[in-house]
Amino acid sequence: MVPQQRAAGGPPPAPDRDPVIDLARFFCLALVVVGHSMMVSPVLHPDGTVTSENTLGDQRWFEPVVWVLQIMPLFFVAGGITGLQSWRRLHARGGTAMYFVQGRLLRLIRPAAVLLAVMFTGLSAALLAGVDPQVIQLLTSGAGMPLWFLAAYLAAQFNLPWLAALHGRAPWLTLAGLTALVVAVDCLRGVLPPLAYLNMVFVWCAVQQLGFIVADSRQLKPGRSALFGIMVASNALLGLLVLLGLYSGNMLVNLNPPNLTLLLLGVSQAAALQLFRPALFRIASQPWVRRLVGLAGRWSMTVYLWHLPLLAAMSGMLLLTNFPQPAGGTAAWWWGRPLVLICVIALLLPVVALFGRLEGRPTPYDPLTGRPAAAVLLAAVAVFVPAVDAVFNGLTLGLLGGGAACFALAVVLLARIPVRHTPRTARSGASKPPLPHPPLSANVEP
């Protein structure tokens, strides 16, 4: 047990890497990329207008399937597990909440800043070259979903240190309080619809809190029957709420803005993660699985941010050619989906090679030495303003450029660049252990 944690009465430190969480994240990321490849379908209408259809989401049979495949809550559960462990390790070394937020912000926004800058430059050039503005808008919208997810994830991680403190004092009361806020917003959203977007914070912070509980589950030691009962109960309650007409049965509809149904899915998925942990551990312990998951984990944010813009770009460019465009939902359209997925993966490879290093964990040093907390807060504002604007008003080319400038400003304010990792002990001779090396960042970082 780490002495600082023993003195503080905290739980023992967890291992730097949990292969089950790595595997869960890999599964989630793969499912997101595959799912989006099956959904996006740009349509060129006879009158010349261009729209984007969600062909898969419009299928009635897909509604019950998405109850299982809506894995966004699992992302936040995993983020809560690793985030809490990372924060406790940092705090034990004397790190502050602002230092934690600084590192989290930087790792997330650095690859996003490059994405926005590249998209703005490329699309502006295409517009000047005479490409139809409708096609430009279709391509611009490709960054919309990554931005809303980034805003929600950053909000949850930004609040993690103080939510972890509340969790340490009263874990169940903290979860109950966040759940009450979610329900209150859901009740008031019919009266004042913009209030619904408060659940972008409340829902995902509550799901993240489930990750805290899972991280400390060794103390609770729930049995397999209890975990199975939690899964059944949460899904039964979810089904009842849908049956009563209080919520849509389509989890894609419930995603933006999120509501109580996503929290209930998070409860079920957190319980499933623990219930199937022994089997998942055996799979994750296979050498080839471990290598694959570890490799993908290093570039997970790059893959997540870029896959949808690349898919939108590929689809939009095809509209400018005479390449056959089968109608969405037809047999020819379905047969073409595997080819679309292969093309997206092929496009991701050079992107990862060029920009994947931006996810490298910043070199640890004394927490915020000479850097006031105001700089971190200003960087957070610079990131959240364009992201929230995109959530409310949609992403336009102008907002894309403004977002790129704001994200670049945030990176400058945080004042770090990717450099080779040098252990803290080697530089200062301090007795405190260094933070995990970059290969572990897939697990201890978001």
Predicted features by range, described:
Residues 2-434, 438-446:
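Alpha-helical transmembrane segments and their immediate juxtamembrane cytosolic regions
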